[in-house]
């Protein structure tokens, strides 16, 4: 993938860029793998906003992705197409299996149309093949990793993501995540070889607010720019600093919000941001 930059023909085009989509081989998705994807605008069944900054955007259909890949062991598949997916930053690959079935998977880097891939403990170590962690050599770069055996891939799914298998210790495999965290994962869990493609996605400059609206992202308004009825930082004559420590719209003090002492914490060998003081 490469980034195509625009000339500053308008203020919105100045500095903006777009993916060149050179790796895409088909513009229409596989109909049998599409599902409806209604929009809710960040609202619950009572009509109240539960997630801010969501609304509008282009209509989408959900592409059903096979994150488990555990029911086609030993069945050879051919990469029929590399496609765009509006629901994720990564590209997706359409597989045609020799038994006639079709599946979508996350497209790893260097996977191309016509490649042969498979899953199972005996699969070769090459991009796109899916194996249990205990069958993958130490030092291999992987993605689409399960956290529980048979639970489907949960980690390493976004564009450019890569996780390294650094060690194996009894029933566990040690993984170095993109955040820097080193974590134990059950060695029976599956992962796919290679890193996720479309790595230049993070370098795209969206250029104008309208492009984010096309993506379904609404504006993020500062609390100090609101009225007192809308936010604890709102109001005041002229520009103000908010007059208090930063808080959320509901009065919760800013800072880290992740719960500590989760049951899964015992699987963390080295935390991300190790040594950083928690607030």
Curated annotation (Swiss-Prot):
Could you describe the subunit structure of this protein? Part of the 50S ribosomal subunit. Forms a bridge to the 30S subunit in the 70S ribosome.
Q: What is this protein called?
A: Large ribosomal subunit protein uL2
Query: Does the UniProt entry include the keyword rRNA-binding?
Result: yes
* Record's function text: One of the primary rRNA binding proteins. Required for association of the 30S and 50S subunits to form the 70S ribosome, for tRNA binding and peptide bond formation. It has been suggested to have peptidyltransferase activity; this is somewhat controversial. Makes several contacts with the 16S rRNA in the 70S ribosome.
- State the InterPro entries in the record: NA-bd_OB-fold, Rib_uL2_dom2, Ribosomal_uL2, Ribosomal_uL2_bac/org-type, Ribosomal_uL2_C, Ribosomal_uL2_CS, Ribosomal_uL2_dom3, Ribosomal_uL2_RNA-bd_dom
- Spell out the NCBIfam families in the cross-references: rplB_bact
- Give the family, as the similarity comment puts it: Belongs to the universal ribosomal protein uL2 family.
Organism, by scientific name, is Clavibacter michiganensis subsp. michiganensis (strain NCPPB 382)
Q: Which GO terms describe its molecular function?
A: rRNA binding; structural constituent of ribosome; transferase activity
Q: Give me the stretches of Basic and acidic residues compositional bias.
A: 253-268
Where does this protein have compositionally biased stretches of type Basic residues?
269-279
């Amino acid at each position: 993938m490469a980034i195509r930059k625009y000339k500053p023909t308008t203020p919105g085009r100045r500095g903006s860029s777009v993916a060149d989509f050179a790796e895409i081989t088909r513009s229409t998705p596989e109909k049998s793998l599409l599902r409806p994807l209604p929009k809710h605008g960040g609202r619950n069944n009572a009509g109240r906003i539960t997630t801010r900054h969501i609304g509008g955007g282009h209509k989408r259909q959900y592409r059903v992705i096979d994150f488990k890949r555990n029911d086609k062991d030993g069945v050879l598949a051919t990469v029929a197409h590399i496609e765009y997916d509006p629901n994720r930053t990564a590209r997706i690959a359409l597989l045609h299996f020799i038994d006639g079935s079709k599946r979508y998977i996350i497209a790893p880097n260097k996977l191309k149309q016509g490649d042969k891939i498979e899953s199972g403990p005996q699969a070769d170590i090459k991009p796109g093949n899916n194996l249990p962690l205990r069958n993958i050599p130490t030092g291999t770069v992987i993605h689409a990793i399960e956290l529980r055996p048979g639970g489907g891939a949960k980690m390493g799914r976004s564009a450019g993501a890569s996780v390294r298998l650094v060690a194996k210790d009894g029933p566990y495999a040690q993984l170095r995540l993109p955040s820097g965290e080193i974590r134990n994962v059950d060695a029976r869990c599956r992962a796919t070889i290679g890193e996720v493609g479309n790595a230049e996605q993070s370098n795209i400059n969206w250029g104008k607010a309208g492009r984010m609206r096309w993506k379904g992202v609404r504006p993020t308004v500062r609390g100090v720019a609101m009225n007192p009825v809308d936010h604890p930082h709102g109001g005041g004559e002229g520009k103000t600093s908010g007059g208090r420590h930063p808080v959320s719209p509901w009065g919760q003090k800013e800072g880290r919000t992740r719960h500590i002492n989760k049951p899964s914490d015992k699987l963390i060998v080295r935390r991300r941001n190790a040594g950083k003081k928690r607030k």
